[in-house]
Amino acid sequence: MKVLIGSDKSGFGLKEEVKAYLAGKGYEMTDCGTLDPEQPKPFFEAAPIAAQKIQSGEFERAILICGTGMGMAIVANKFEGVYAACCESTYAAEKCRAINDANILTMGGWIIAGILGCEMAETFLTTGFTENLEEWRQEFLKGAKQKVGAIEESIYRKG
């Protein structure tokens, strides 16, 4: 699977750990964020790059890391069809995929330790929408996804 990853200066260390870990697991990694901490790319520049690549279908999933993960999530979620989830546990990384079908995981480099970040990223990439949920909940969530899509459609199609 091709995975897009990016960070600002605050998320650089964690991003490098996660990128190396996932590459070692066979993921094809593309970095759209800070490549050199001496020449950082701010979160408000890295997140739109990732969001647009998700929108276009060039990538199915992305991982973005800033200080708290929140700035990346806020900016990425401005783009239609992008569902960025700021997570601080492996459980949340799993559930943002299984319940919400998130396509971008955001994490905080000031908050998440390296091994946890690697586990969260792998869980995010290997969990499918409605995976391991009861049948009634799967049906509910598929319907909810359509309703959320209709809300999104009404917002982006105004004017």
Curated annotation (Swiss-Prot):
The keyword Transport does not apply. Its EC number is 5.3.1.37. The active site is at residue 66. InterPro entries: RpiB_LacA_LacB (IPR003500), RpiB_LacA_LacB_sf (IPR036569). Pfam families: LacAB_rpiB (PF02502). It catalyses: 4-deoxy-4-sulfo-D-erythrose = 4-deoxy-4-sulfo-D-erythrulose. Keywords: Carbohydrate metabolism, Isomerase. One of its GO terms (molecular function) is ribose-5-phosphate isomerase activity. The keyword Nucleus does not apply. One of its GO terms (biological process) is D-allose catabolic process. Part of the sulfo-TK pathway, a D-sulfoquinovose degradation pathway that produces 2-hydroxyethane-1-sulfonate (isethionate). Catalyzes the isomerization of 4-deoxy-4-sulfo-D-erythrose (SE) to 4-deoxy-4-sulfo-D-erythrulose (SEu). PANTHER family: DNA DAMAGE-REPAIR_TOLERATION PROTEIN DRT102, RIBOSE-5-PHOSPHATE ISOMERASE B. Belongs to the LacAB/RpiB family. This is 4-deoxy-4-sulfo-D-erythrose isomerase. It comes from Clostridium sp. (strain MSTE9). The gene is sqwI.
